[in-house]
Amino acid sequence: MIYLDHSATTKPYKEVCDTVCRALREDFWNPASMYRPAAAVAGKMKTAFASLASDLGCEPSELIQTSCATEASNMALKGLFSRYGTRLNTIIATEADHDATLSTLNYLEQHGARIILLKPLKNGLIDPDDLEHVLDERTLCVSLLWVNNETGVVQDLETLCKVIRRKAPECFIHADMVQAWGKIDFSLQDLDVDLASFSAHKIHGPKGTGLLYKRKKVIPDVLIHGGGQQNGWRSGTENWPLLAGMAKASAMQKESFARRKERVRV
């Protein structure tokens, strides 16, 4: 079988598999424990977050490890509505969004949110005028699927963000960047988004892990309570082996992207 559906998943790099297996064998300690080997693993986690932050163009403290991009989007949208929903109750997305977004919005609608789903143009793009028309002072969040997982349509994120900031300055912007990671050259510090979702298995990384990018100023309610791991944003024993694999995949994918980009230029 010739497998080409890399929008569904990718085969992990051999080096990623080796990294995960080595971490499972040698660094099995709980990073939250107090003894020396566990502290060493916690230090390695900081290094991995720093590497991912460098690749994505943000601060390490702005990244939260999740089990997948679906969880990241749930954390973003449910967390925002839980904190601000009594004052800002409208969330805007499109009919063509990923089920991770649409199902979450369906849940929030049942709990009092006002959901507006824009219909994309025939070319798959969001009409900025359509977006501006539905924005108002009660808009909590606009969720944008930057690269569509089925059609490959790339939204004009810069233009849409400008429309949102001008018409609804209090509104948060969430972006599903799952299909953009490793395929588009970007830096989060240059993008005007407040939250973003990422998945490791779309960049030849391991399944079962992803990231939520959250700007420092953004404070959604916490969904998972417990031991206070990840600065309290996502409690539960941290998954160092998969974080190590994700960081390795990100670094390798960045190098691969640079080579592919140069080859296309030639």
Regions found by a protein language model. Give the residues of each.
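Pyridoxal 5′-phosphate
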Residues: M1-V266
